[in-house]
């Protein structure tokens, strides 16, 4: 299983939070929240216990 990552992330509402995730894959496309094609990190959000798609350009800093 991949190692957990921790990073600061700015969501579509411009709110910044620290996220701890287990990566699943990197993919290119768009989502409901990001209407332009871009790179995403699909990961298991360990705090919410849900799979999420994180826009790579909105990852501010790895911790």
Where do the PLM segments sit?
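Short glycine- and basic-residue-enriched patches
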Residues: 1-63
């Amino acid at each position: 299983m991949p190692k957990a990552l921790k990073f600061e992330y700015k969501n579509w509402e411009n709110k910044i939070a620290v996220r701890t995730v287990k990566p699943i894959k990197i993919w290119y496309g768009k989502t409901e929240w990001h209407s332009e094609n871009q790179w995403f990190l699909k990961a298991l959000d360990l705090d919410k216990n849900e799979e999420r798609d994180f826009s790579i350009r909105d990852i501010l800093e790895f911790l």
